[in-house]
Swiss-Prot record:
Inducers of expression: Expressed in both exponential and stationary phase; expression is considerably higher in exponential phase (at protein level).
Species classification: Bacteria, Pseudomonadati, Pseudomonadota, Gammaproteobacteria, Enterobacterales
Protein name (record): Protein YliM
Source organism of the structure: Escherichia coli (strain K12)
Domain of life: Bacteria
């Protein structure tokens, strides 16, 4: 599931994905 959100979000949020959750 985490990978799914990662793909949706831009590359810039790749590292911030943890913050955005």
């Amino acid at each position: 599931m985490e990978t799914f959100c990662y793909m949706k979000w831009p590359v810039r949020h790749h590292k911030s994905r943890r913050v955005s959750h």
